[in-house]
């Protein structure tokens, strides 16, 4: 069966490198949403904990329950309040109109819209939001924002930073000992992080976004069959690839049902073993020159992202959670 190998030493190296930049492991919030961006949240959670990480963020209550044994603090980023929230978790408040829908005495982090205009409360409406929170039975323990253009070389990043500083100054008049976090992976290496803030790290912890980091995920496939493709014979749906000479080919057990982008046989998609995929990818398999029982499909999601004109995030998060993941 296909396999994802996670390099434990590389992951630990990345976390140490990032913690050194921030100042400590205690100021890290590891974002493990969507199965840790496809890498395997339950596999990585104990590694992060053992290094000193105590705070993580996930998408949903279901994701939080999968790793709650490992962390003291788990922030749920995309929750729709239903009145039966778990006091074990912390919930992002993305819309002030939802205050009344939460269970009483639940811990929340207030999301501030500093310019991305996706989720959160605008700075102009913060005073009203503070009044509603203070009159409710919710426990405000933190406040955060998300930078829309931290990886762009324009001024919007700095405008958002300034807006968040204004929000912090305002909320500090009414609440003390709040946990603030604004810097994400893209913002991590763009200057100094405020001393009163934590840092949310997403894809950067897995080796992307800085040349000093190490990729931790490698995708492997295993051989299903092998044959001699004779000169003039074609392989796969539509016969896109035709052999110009006799060649030994093999079919391997990964396809678009496993979360891979479907290769249509056009252009040269080079696999991690240096061989090109031959013909169209099938639902559960692909073909290439015979390279043994196990081959590396990719070690760097950027290569596939460039080929399919997308981003590395999409390549990784689409990887089927049913693919076995192991530490190496």
UniProtKB/Swiss-Prot annotation:
Cofactor(s) essential for the protein: pyridoxal 5'-phosphate
Pathway connected to this protein: Amino-acid biosynthesis; D-alanine biosynthesis; D-alanine from L-alanine: step 1/1
Positions carrying N6-(pyridoxal phosphate)lysine: 33
InterPro entries: Ala_racemase, Ala_racemase/Decarboxylase_C, Ala_racemase_C, Ala_racemase_N, Ala_racemase_pyridoxalP-BS, PLP-binding_barrel
Active site: 33 (proton acceptor), 237 (proton acceptor)
EC number: 5.1.1.1
The entry's keywords: Isomerase, Pyridoxal phosphate
Amino acids binding substrate: 118, 283
Catalytic activity of the protein: L-alanine = D-alanine
A biological-process GO annotation: peptidoglycan biosynthetic process
Any Gene Ontology CC annotation: cytosol
GO molecular function, one term: pyridoxal phosphate binding
Listed NCBIfam families: alr (TIGR00492), PRK00053.2-2 (NF000791)
PANTHER family associated with the record: ALANINE RACEMASE, ALANINE RACEMASE, CATABOLIC-RELATED
Family note: Belongs to the alanine racemase family.
Function: Catalyzes the interconversion of L-alanine and D-alanine. May also act on other amino acids.
Protein name per Swiss-Prot or TrEMBL: Alanine racemase
Taxonomic source organism: Campylobacter jejuni subsp. doylei (strain ATCC BAA-1458 / RM4099 / 269.97)
Name of the gene this protein is made from: alr
């Amino acid at each position: 069966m296909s396999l994802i190998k996670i390099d434990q030493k590389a992951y630990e190296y990345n976390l140490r490198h990032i913690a050194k930049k921030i100042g400590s492991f205690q100021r890290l919030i590891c974002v493990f949403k969507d199965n840790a961006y496809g890498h395997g949240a339950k596999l990585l959670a104990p590694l992060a904990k053992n290094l000193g990480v105590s705070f993580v963020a996930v998408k949903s209550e279901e994701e939080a329950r999968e790793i709650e044994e490992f962390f003291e603090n788990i922030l749920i980023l995309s929750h729709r309040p239903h009145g039966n929230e778990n006091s074990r978790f912390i919930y992002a408040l993305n819309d002030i109109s939802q205050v009344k829908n939460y269970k009483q005495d639940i811990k929340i982090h207030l999301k501030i819209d500093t310019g991305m205009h996706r989720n959160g409360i605008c700075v102009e409406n913060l005073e009203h939001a503070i009044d509603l929170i203070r009159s409710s039975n919710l426990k405000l323990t933190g406040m955060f924002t998300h930078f829309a253009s931290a990886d762009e070389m324009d001024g919007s990043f700095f405008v958002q930073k300034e807006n968040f500083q204004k929000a912090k100054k305002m909320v500090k008049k009414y609440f003390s000992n709040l946990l603030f976090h604004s810097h994400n992976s893209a913002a991590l290496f763009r200057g100094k992080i405020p001393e009163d803030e934590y840092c949310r790290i997403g894809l950067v912890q897995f080796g992307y976004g800085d040349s000093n980091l190490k990729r931790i995920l490698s995708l492997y496939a295993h051989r299903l069959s092998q044959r001699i493709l004779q000169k003039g014979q074609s392989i796969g749906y539509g016969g896109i690839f035709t052999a110009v000479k006799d060649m030994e080919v093999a079919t391997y057990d990964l396809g678009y049902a496993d979360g891979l982008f479907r290769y249509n046989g056009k252009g040269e998609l080079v696999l991690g073993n240096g061989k090109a995929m031959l013909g169209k990818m099938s639902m559960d398999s692909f073909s290439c020159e015979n390279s043994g029982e196990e081959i590396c499909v990719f070690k760097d999601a950027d290569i596939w992202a460039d080929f399919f004109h997308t981003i590395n995030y999409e390549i990784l998060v689409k990887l089927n959670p049913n693919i076995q993941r192991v530490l190496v």
